Curated annotation (Swiss-Prot):
Pfam families in the record: SPOUT_MTase
One GO term describing the cellular component: cytoplasm
Organism from which the protein derives: Pseudoalteromonas translucida (strain TAC 125)
Name of this chain's protein: Ribosomal RNA large subunit methyltransferase H
Binding site for S-adenosyl-L-methionine: 73, 104, 123-128
Enzyme Commission number, as recorded: 2.1.1.177
Subunit structure: Homodimer.
Family per similarity comment: Belongs to the RNA methyltransferase RlmH family.
Amino acid sequence: MKIQMIAVGTKMPAWVETGFTEYQRRFAKDMTLELIEIPAGKRGKNADIKRILHIEGEKTLAAIPKGNRIVTLEVTGKPLDTHELAKNMEKWQLDGRDVSLLIGGPEGLAPECIAASEQKWSLSNLTLPHPLVRIIVAESLYRGWSLNNNHPYHRE
């Protein structure tokens, strides 16, 4: 199964790329994690945020391969503990489809992305910086994968 993380924002600090890549490379051949970056719209003093969100949403949806399961990361989504995420990942694999995880920009995801979502996942009630979310999600996915594959990474 391939999991695509489709995230609004480019030009992340080196520590973000290093952290994401560290977990990305750990997956075995049966599970791959790919990052697709969507350029964020320019946000200035008088920016039309609704329009920017719409454009980001169109670009995000265009990056999703046909047939992929769409999972959005949202504050209002369902919080998952490690075991619940692992069970979800197991279901995703049995479903036979690849997964696109959508991460919005500073104002979140466009309404059209949320509408296309099959599952909404909340990482936390905290507001997290978007660069850090990439690493947290990559690590969480790796931890879930390790649980499903009896890999010693996760310890109770």
